[in-house]
């Protein structure tokens, strides 16, 4: 047996132990463990624990001197603190957050949040690889450029759908020329922002070659990112434009960022217009159709319309010139090329619901509150009509049953 206090450990003044204590004490405290040693005390004839951290020992000594009882700390005083002080603060904070959420105007961050939530059910696997890119500044500038372009594109569609007279007036020509010039400038501005994303500026972790650091291209990562990216852009534009023109937005986004060979919305539209005639083609007709399509090598080197605005081939240049001459039966005048870099300093116009007060929209879906109320009232009206129809049908059935019963009795 040992006399006094028998220590079964290394002496306290050992320098390596102090270094170890300083490095790992915080980790062990988080796990609920302490560094120390067990020793035998002859006075109490029991094992006792001594901690290596002096700060803890000082605190314990202070507590022993004051004779603090833990039962008192868990009594009614703590209950009064939690019940009367902390709970009202949480309720007040929730109310203030709701009020702050209703204040201000709708921003692009609000639309991104709603779009991400709406896509989680259907496109969860693709969108998960895109969530880390949500707060990138290059993404915000690209989305604003896309919305800026789509606003003029939808304006052009509305002008084309208007009934046109045989003699187009001078005012209509000026309006069409103005919209087409703005649309062309917006497409060039969008192309610059899109090229930054393709080159991986500010997003090396999403680039297929890690911006030149990797020697092998990760095509799977590139495909997943851009597929989720196109879906996300379509959803954002649909929400911004009050959940209208979904088909037009899908087709235009597919046309901008895909070639004709890989444009899925265009193929769907062509199949709907043809009415399934391609399935009933003869072999000669099928060969003629396939002869018009480019070879695989050419299809791999083809550029999307957005990229071809900045880096067009000779054939694409000639095709774009021929398309721009005549729009809606009107010959457009050639105009001088503008410096697109000046668009950076120009304040973007308010597009769709962006910039409008938040209190006019549902914070979870960004739907206008008026449309939701109209939908509820229309639902109520439809339910009333259904009830009336059922009651009328019941009375008619009752009358018919009585008539048949009267006719069945003998006279």
UniProtKB/Swiss-Prot annotation:
One of its GO terms (molecular function) is protein phosphatase inhibitor activity. Disulfide bonds: none annotated. It comes from the Eukaryota. Keywords: Protein phosphatase inhibitor. It holds the Pfam family PPPI_inhib. PANTHER family: PROTEIN PHOSPHATASE 1 REGULATORY SUBUNIT 36. Interacts with PPP1CA. Inhibits phosphatase activity of protein phosphatase 1 (PP1) complexes. This is Protein phosphatase 1 regulatory subunit 36.
């Amino acid at each position: 047996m040992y006399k006094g206090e028998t220590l079964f450990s290394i002496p306290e003044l050992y320098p390596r132990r102090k270094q170890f204590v300083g490095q790992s004490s915080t980790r062990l405290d988080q796990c609920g463990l302490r560094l120390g040693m067990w020793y035998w005390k002859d006075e109490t004839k029991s094992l006792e624990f001594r901690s290596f951290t002096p700060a803890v020992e000082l605190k314990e000594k202070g507590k022993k001197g004051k004779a603090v009882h833990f039962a008192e700390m868990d009594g009614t005083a703590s209950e009064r603190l939690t019940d009367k002080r902390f709970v009202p603060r949480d309720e007040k904070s929730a109310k203030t957050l709701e009020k702050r959420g209703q204040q201000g105007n709708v921003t692009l961050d609000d639309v991104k949040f709603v779009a991400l939530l709406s896509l989680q059910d259907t496109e969860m696997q693709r969108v998960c690889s895109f969530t880390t890119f949500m707060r990138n500044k290059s993404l915000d500038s690209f989305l604003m450029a896309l919305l800026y372009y789509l606003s003029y594109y939808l304006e052009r569609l509305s002008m084309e759908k208007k009934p046109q007279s045989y003699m187009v007036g001078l005012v209509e020509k000026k309006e069409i020329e103005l919209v087409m010039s703005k649309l062309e400038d917006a497409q060039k501005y969008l192309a610059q922002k899109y090229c930054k994303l393709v080159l991986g500026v500010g997003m090396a972790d999403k680039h297929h070659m890690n911006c030149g650091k990797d020697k092998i291209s990760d095509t799977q990562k590139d495909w997943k990112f851009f597929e989720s990216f196109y879906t996300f852009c379509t959803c954002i534009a649909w929400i911004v434009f009050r959940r209208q023109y979904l088909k037009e937005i899908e087709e235009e986004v597919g046309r901008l960022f895909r070639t004709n060979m890989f444009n899925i919305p265009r193929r769907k539209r062509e199949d709907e217009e043809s009415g399934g005639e391609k399935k009933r083609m003869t072999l000669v007709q099928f060969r003629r159709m396939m002869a018009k399509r480019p070879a695989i090598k050419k299809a791999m080197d083809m550029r999307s319309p957005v990229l071809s605005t900045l880096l067009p081939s000779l054939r694409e240049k000639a095709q774009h010139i021929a398309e721009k001459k005549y729009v809606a039966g009107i010959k457009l005048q050639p105009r001088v090329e503008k410096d697109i870099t000046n668009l950076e300093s120009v304040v973007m116009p308010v597009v769709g619901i962006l910039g409008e007060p938040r209190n006019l929209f549902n914070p979870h879906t960004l739907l206008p509150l008026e449309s939701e109320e109209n939908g509820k009232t229309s639902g109520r009206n439809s339910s009333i009509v259904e009830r009336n129809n059922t009651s009328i049908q019941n009375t008619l059935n009752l009358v018919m049953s009585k008539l048949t019963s009267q006719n069945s009795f003998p006279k």
